[in-house]
Amino acid sequence: MSNIIKALEQEQMKQDLPKFAPGDTVVVQVKVKEGNRERLQAYEGVVIAIRNRGLHSAFTVRKISNGEGVERTFQTHSPVVDSIEVKRRGAVRRAKLYYLRERSGKSARIKEKLAKK
C-alpha cells in the first residue's frame, strides 16, 4: 500500500528545482490570481528554514519590507510556486536560522559562500 502512495507522491513532485540551503538568498516566483487574470509575483529573501518531507516539503523565506521583517512559508512542490532562483549562496552553520528574527541591520547579514575550485 505504501508503495502506491510513494509512487503517486513521486509523480506529483517537481523535478526541476535548484539545490538551495538555509542562508541562501532566493527569488521565488509566486502565481497570484487577481480576479480572472493570473500574474507572477517575485518574493526575494533569505531561506531561514527547510522542511524535507517528500511531497510535503516546505521552506521559509525572510525578507525586510519597509523596515519590517516578513516571513513566508512556501510548499516546495506547490503549483502556486512557479520557479525558484538562487541569487547567492550563504555560508551558515545552522539548519534553522531563527536567530535572524531578533537581529536587524549589519548583524543580520550572512557571509557569502565561496565557490569550490
UniProtKB/Swiss-Prot annotation:
Disulfide bonds: none annotated. GO terms for molecular function: structural constituent of ribosome. InterPro entries: Ribosomal_bL19, Ribosomal_bL19_CS, Ribosomal_bL19_sf, Translation_prot_SH3-like_sf. GO terms for cellular component: cytosolic large ribosomal subunit. Transmembrane segments: none annotated. PROSITE patterns: RIBOSOMAL_L19 (PS01015). This protein is located at the 30S-50S ribosomal subunit interface and may play a role in the structure and function of the aminoacyl-tRNA binding site. PANTHER family: LARGE RIBOSOMAL SUBUNIT PROTEIN BL19M, RIBOSOMAL PROTEIN L19. This is Large ribosomal subunit protein bL19. It comes from Vibrio vulnificus (strain CMCP6).
